């Protein structure tokens, strides 16, 4: 078929006298060529289309694999529609009402739109909070970062097989999941040289990758780390993590005293069970459905969500933890039983987290931590090595108790200051309101006086005497002022 | 119901990232090799009973630590209350062997005034073809620091029991001799619930020793 036009072409070249036929032939030839070319183009186009279909099928397949987890809380149809509307606004970068988002998020998030919703929440967060210049990440594109080499390569490679090792998307050695994870972690380690790579980050990156593309995940990782400040806890000195452990311990002390005492008696400090909660945002131990829900709230509120979830988890299981009688059984419970709770329990936890507000306490405890550290340092300078240990121990215990008492007092004082401050604020706003009221009244008064002047000029002199009489009357009875003033 | 034990020892397992600390512990406490595992973020805890002599059981509390350097600010807090330690390196990773010295220094600073009885463990000995550290040089280094040396494999279950029980025995001897004593405010060694039978046999052993002197 394909050769035929050529044969005709070749044979037709020598025959001179039969020009008409030749022309006819060449026309045929041309049309045949046209047809052939046309078909070739069509073929190519179909092939391309086919490839596209295949790619989208692959993507769908991988999306299915990525999102294959049981959701905590089912999303109603109406909620889906509201999210659709919100996501449209997202493109226009319109600032949404916080209260509104909060309600919507509480209702649920469909997992198929979760990635987009996180990006929407990040945008909203950025519209409300601007980062000071100092804390901004360097402005280098993801593609540019991928071209470079990282000193953290070994540490990252080693963790690839240990991040969600049983999840089908990440389990294949150097499969698509692990490759994306490597790229993302490498790029971040190059962007944030101070943090580089810290164990725990791979889980956060992994959760993001299950819901969006690599580049979007990079943008969202940047958001969590810089805008919301999660990067602090991964810094080489891990100071911030220590503070967080202290804050959690204090929260337990203040709100769940029995549980706190029980854990203290058995020498279980938060660093033993809560470090992975903070560093992997619950992703290394808890089910993906729960983790995704926690991430929903993190994208809305930031780092304090981890405390809320931790507190809610511990308090919801308080009776069971109290029943564990020794160190081993408590650790076992916190490590294995707690992350394994059922979906309805998880839903309850999430609902509780939406209703909590502990930002003031967290702030106060952070201040406390620093005060305590300073005091500890001073006292360690003061004491001498030769003193008997027992005495020091006793003094230490006493000081500890004293510290606790003082801390409680400090907290009360903080609360008092807070109420006083809010009172003051109220008074100040009232004062300014009053001041502006006075100003408007004065202006009004001047206007009236002017009107009176004008009226006086317009009136004949004999009427003026009458008027003055009236005015005197008015001064005695100010309620009539407005009425008379309006009369020309 | 709490099992009956004579003493409780607290052990700590340290060493570079990915030398196989968690796998070794899990082989010892759970009796299986974990094909997939998460990295240890912070510290983790395991426990097991060991019978060192018929009727004499010791409870081991084993603390697993994160290997990545920046986690030391957290794991450090757990050195002080440990009586024994397994210092791991990977025989197929020379770097992890070179860091042994640094690990010892690190613990020394933070364990004072107490001391940790260490055993040096060359791990992953099933991967002999990829070996980068010879047995001879590891033994030499261990001797220089007054430690025992043992090679183990969690995958093939080689010497895992031995590594833990030998260390436990050594500590037990030190406790018996009075070189390590139970102290208030220190969790390294605790004495447990001792039934009368065991107690009396202990007394017998003690009096016999006294006679020998």
UniProtKB/Swiss-Prot annotation, chain B:
One of its GO terms (biological process) is Rab protein signal transduction. Residues 35-43 are annotated as: Switch-I. Its main location: membrane. SMART domains: RAB, RAN, RAS, RHO. Its EC number is 3.6.5.2. Mg(2+) binds at residues 22, 40, 64. It is a lipid-anchor. GTP binds at residues 17, 20-23, 37, 40, 67, 123-124, 126, 154-155. GO terms for cellular component: cytoplasmic vesicle membrane; Golgi apparatus; neuron projection; plasma membrane. Belongs to the small GTPase superfamily. Rab family. PANTHER family: DRAB11-RELATED. This is Ras-related protein Rab-39B. It comes from Bos taurus (Bovine). The lineage of its organism: Eukaryota, Metazoa, Chordata, Craniata, Vertebrata. The gene is RAB39B.
């Amino acid at each position: 078929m394909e050769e035929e036009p050529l044969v005709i072409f070749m044979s037709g070249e020598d025959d001179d006298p039969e020009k008409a036929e030749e022309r006819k032939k060449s026309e045929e030839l041309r049309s045949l060529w046209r047809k052939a070319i046309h078909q070739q183009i069509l073929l190519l186009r179909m092939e391309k289309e086919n490839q596209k279909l295949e790619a989208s099928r692959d993507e769908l397949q991988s999306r299915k694999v990525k999102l294959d987890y049981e959701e905590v809380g089912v999303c109603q149809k109406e909620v889906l529609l509201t999210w659709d509307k919100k996501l449209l606004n997202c493109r226009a970068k319109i600032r949404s009402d916080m209260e509104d988002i909060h309600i919507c998020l509480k209702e649920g998030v469909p997992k198929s739109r979760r990635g987009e919703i996180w990006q929407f929440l990040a945008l909203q967060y950025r519209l409300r909070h601007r980062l000071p210049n100092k804390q901004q990440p360097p402005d280098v594109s993801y593609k540019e970062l991928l071209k470079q080499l990282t000193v953290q390569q070994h540490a990252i490679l080693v963790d690839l097989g240990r991040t969600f090792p049983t999840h089908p998307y990440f389990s294949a050695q150097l499969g698509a999941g692990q490759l994306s994870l490597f790229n993302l972690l490498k790029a971040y380690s190059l962007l944030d040289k101070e943090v580089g790579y810290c164990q725990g980050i791979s889980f956060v990156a992994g959760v993001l990758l299950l819901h969006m593309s690599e580049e979007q995940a990079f943008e969202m990782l940047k958001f969590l780390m810089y805008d919301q400040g999660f990067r602090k806890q991964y810094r080489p000195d891990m100071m911030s993590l220590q503070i967080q452990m202290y804050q959690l311990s204090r929260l337990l002390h203040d709100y769940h005293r029995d549980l706190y005492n029980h854990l203290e008696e058995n020498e279980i400090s938060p660093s033993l069970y809560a470090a992975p909660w903070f560093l992997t945002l619950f992703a290394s131990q808890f089910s993906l459905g729960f983790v995704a829900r926690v991430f929903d709230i993190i994208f809305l509120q930031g780092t304090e969500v981890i405390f809320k979830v931790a507190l809610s988890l511990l308090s919801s299981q308080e009776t069971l933890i109290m029943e564990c009688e020794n160190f081993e059984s408590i650790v076992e419970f916190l490590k294995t039983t707690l992350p394994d709770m059922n979906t309805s329990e998880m839903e309850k936890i999430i609902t509780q987290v939406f209703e909590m507000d502990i930002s003031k306490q967290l702030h106060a405890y952070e201040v406390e931590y620093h005060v305590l550290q300073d005091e500890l340092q001073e006292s360690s300078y003061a004491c001498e090595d030769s003193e008997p240990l027992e005495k020091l121990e006793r003094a230490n215990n006493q000081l500890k108790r004293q510290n606790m008492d003082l801390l409680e007092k400090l907290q009360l004082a903080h609360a008092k200051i807070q109420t006083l401050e809010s009172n003051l604020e109220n008074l100040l706003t009232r004062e300014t309101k009053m001041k502006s009221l006075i100003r408007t009244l004065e202006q009004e008064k001047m206007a009236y006086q002017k009107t009176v002047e004008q009226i006086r000029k317009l009136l004949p002199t004999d009427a003026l005497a009458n008027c003055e009489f009236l005015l005197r009357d008015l001064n005695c009875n100010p309620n009539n002022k407005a009425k008379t003033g309006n009369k020309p | 119901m709490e099992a009956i034990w004579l003493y409780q020892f607290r052990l700590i397992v340290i060493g570079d990232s990915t030398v196989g600390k968690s796998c070794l512990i899990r082989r010892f406490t759970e009796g299986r090799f974990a094909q997939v595992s998460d990295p240890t973020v912070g510290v983790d805890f395991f426990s097991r009973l060991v019978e060192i002599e018929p009727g004499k059981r010791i409870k081991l509390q084993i603390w697993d630590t994160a290997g990545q350097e920046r986690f030391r600010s957290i794991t450090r807090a757990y050195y002080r209350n440990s009586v024994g330690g397994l210092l791991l390196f990977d025989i197929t990773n020379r770097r992890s062997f070179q860091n042994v010295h640094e690990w010892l220094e690190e613990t020394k600073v933070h364990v004072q005034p107490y001391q940790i009885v260490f055993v040096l463990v060359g791990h992953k000995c099933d991967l002999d073809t990829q070996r980068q550290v010879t047995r001879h040089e590891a033994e030499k280094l261990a001797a220089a620091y007054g430690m025992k040396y043992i090679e183990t494999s969690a995958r093939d279950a080689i010497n895992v029991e031995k590594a833990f029980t030998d260390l436990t025995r050594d500590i037990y001897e030190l406790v018996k001799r009075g070189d390590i004593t139970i102290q208030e405010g220190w969790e390294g060694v605790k004495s447990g619930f001792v039934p009368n039978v065991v107690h009396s046999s202990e007394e017998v052993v003690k009096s016999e020793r006294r006679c020998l002197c």
